[in-house]
């Protein structure tokens, strides 16, 4: 018997810190979000922890290693049955290069967040990060 709830897939993203700045990445696809900015990450696969998924996704998308810090309080709906969880992370090895789904990366200070053309679905997560790091 079904209870009427649909299955939710978690998407994890990393607010990677370095020298007082956070790494943001510009999407290349799908077309409706191309050119918009986000914190990089991806979907948690079945049987995978959020932390392992985030380390894997950042390695695949940017070619670097990170350590995962605190999760920013909140859960933000994306499209369909996807929800976003945002973690603070620290770069520990490598120089980030956009390898998949992104064509540019930038390091921005929190004070510059308002000048970033964020994905609409990320705006509330960005606001929560700003509040958590104030």
PLM segments and residue spans:
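Active-site-adjacent beta-strand/loop module that shapes the phosphate/pyrophosphate-binding cleft
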Residues: 65, 73-97, 106, 129
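Conserved Nudix-box catalytic region and its N-terminal flanking loop in Nudix hydrolases
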Residues: 21-60, 64
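NUDIX/MutT-family hydrolases
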Residues: 88, 97-134
